Regions:
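Short, well-ordered alpha-helical segments enriched in acidic and aromatic residues
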Residues: 14-31
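Amphipathic alpha-helical repeat scaffolds
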Residues: 6-10
Length: 116
């Protein structure tokens, strides 16, 4: 599935949990920018479905997705949420490892923090 990462990101942005579930492997591992880790379909789906609706003003803008062979992809994007009534934009890179069946087996999230 060449467009698996794009489908996954669109489903995250639109809170389409059925599509997210279709895109991920049973043994998915997600490692967040602060070392937080969720392993397995159940834990990951519970985390993401609980978190996303709580983010006020959430928006995702995908700049590009780059596939490296059949096993890895990189997504450059930004996520925006409202903080104290003002939009806060966070640039990110997500690194995806893809399983043999094309589903997402691992997601590593890296964020760009402001200097200071």
């Amino acid at each position: 599935m060449v467009d698996i990462v794009e489908r996954y990101l669109d489903a995250i942005a639109t809170h389409d949990w059925g599509v997210v579930d279709d895109c991920i492997a049973d043994d998915i591992v997600r490692v967040g920018p602060y070392g937080d880790r969720y392993a397995g379909r159940g834990d990951y789906m519970a985390f993401i479905a609980d978190l996303m609706p709580k983010l006020p003003g959430y928006a995702m803008k995908v700049e590009r997705v780059t596939y490296v062979g059949d096993a890895r992809a990189y997504a450059e994007l930004s996520e925006t949420v409202e903080l104290d009534g003002k939009p806060m934009r966070t640039p990110e890179v997500l690194v995806f490892e893809l399983a043999d069946d094309g589903r997402i087996a691992r997601v590593d999230v890296f964020i760009q923090t402001p200097q200071g």
